[in-house]
């Protein structure tokens, strides 16, 4: 009889262990949350582990890397340990509510993980250095100050700043950042961007069915009454019904509505600078963005509410104004109906404070 040598037995055990670990990586990376933690697009390679190989050797193909791993020397074992350790580190970051989102932002926007010193990355410092480099922040007495006053639609890094605000919201609330919701997102204006009344016409008539039912629900939930708002909305709705068949009178109705301080908000009252301010911008899935087009705020909010499972956390809070003090919100219940200059300012300042709180 021939017996396996100690060396061949060790090799077989190593290969069995590698196979089990390989299978674990393949299985766990099929979880969308973990996959999108360090990938921006769906897997098209067939094998999920290829994404780990590409981090370590961006220019190597899967076949080349796999061939090296099939070797039968100590280097093979060492190489595999690096692969598996990187996977374990990615998973550890992903599962950590305190730093996971910061790690995701850093990997996506600032640096790669090819350097084996990735375990020593200080994500807060990486992000602070990036913000200062791009002139989005300054540092004084060891504290970072975020500059959002001049950041708006079309500017460099506007998407990244909104992403970072969402990340910091999740870190602050100790909730897992929704990595799988970060794909196919558009930057969307909360208050309608398009003021072309021809385009706005149909959306306007369709949208204004919503306010009365919404007001009634808000008043009921808060046990409040505000007859002025209710009467104005009821009157508006009645006029809409009368004019619906005579759309050539739309312009007259539109002009009349703009004369009322409350009702004018239904059709938007932000000037061009406010519309493009970061406080009027959110990230929304492209499908939802297209579905409500130029609808007014109350209609948009209804769409958002129905699709809340697909929405980034801070976007939801923006549409439902959870950054307002509760007593202040109840005192200004009409704010529930539209998005104002004050909202733009509040959301921008809220995002600024969030980022500073988490990074300092």
Please place each PLM-identified region on the residue numbering.
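Flexible coil/loop and intrinsically disordered segments
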Residues: 1-2, 6-360
């Amino acid at each position: 009889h021939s017996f396996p040598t100690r060396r061949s037995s060790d090799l077989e055990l190593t290969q069995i262990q590698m196979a089990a670990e390989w299978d674990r990586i393949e299985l766990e990376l099929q979880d969308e949350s973990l996959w999108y933690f360090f990938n921006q697009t769906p897997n098209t390679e067939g094998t999920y582990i290829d994404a780990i190989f590409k981090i370590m050797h961006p220019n190597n193909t899967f076949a080349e890397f796999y061939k090296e791993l099939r070797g039968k020397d100590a280097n093979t074992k060492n190489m595999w340990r690096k692969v598996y350790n990187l996977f374990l580190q990615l998973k550890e970051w992903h599962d950590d509510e305190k730093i996971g989102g910061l790690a995701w932002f850093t990997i996506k926007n600032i640096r790669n993980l090819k350097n084996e010193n990735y375990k020593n990355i200080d994500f807060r410092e990486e992000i602070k250095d990036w913000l200062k480099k791009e002139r989005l922040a300054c540092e004084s007495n060891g504290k970072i100050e975020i500059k959002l006053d001049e950041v708006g639609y079309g500017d460099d890094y506007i998407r990244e700043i909104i992403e970072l605000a969402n990340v910091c919201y999740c870190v602050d609330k100790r909730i897992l950042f929704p990595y799988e919701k970060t794909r196919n997102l558009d930057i969307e204006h909360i208050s309608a961007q398009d003021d072309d009344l021809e385009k706005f016409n149909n959306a306007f008539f369709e949208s204004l069915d919503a306010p009365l039912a919404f007001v009634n629900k808000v008043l009921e939930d808060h046990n409040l009454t505000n007859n002025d708002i209710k009467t104005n909305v009821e009157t508006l709705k009645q006029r809409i019904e009368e004019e619906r068949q005579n759309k050539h009178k739309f312009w007259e109705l539109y002009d009349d509505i703009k004369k009322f301080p409350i009702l004018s908000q239904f059709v938007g009252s932000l000037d061009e600078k406010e519309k493009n301010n970061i406080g009027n911008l959110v990230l929304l899935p492209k499908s939802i963005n297209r579905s409500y087009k130029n609808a007014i705020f109350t209609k948009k909010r209804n769409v958002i509410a129905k699709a809340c499972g697909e929405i980034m956390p801070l976007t939801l809070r923006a549409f439902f104004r959870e950054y307002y003090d509760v007593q202040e919100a109840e005192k200004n219940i009409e704010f529930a109906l539209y998005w104002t200059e004050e909202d733009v300012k509040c959301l921008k300042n809220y995002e600024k404070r969030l980022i500073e709180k988490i990074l300092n």
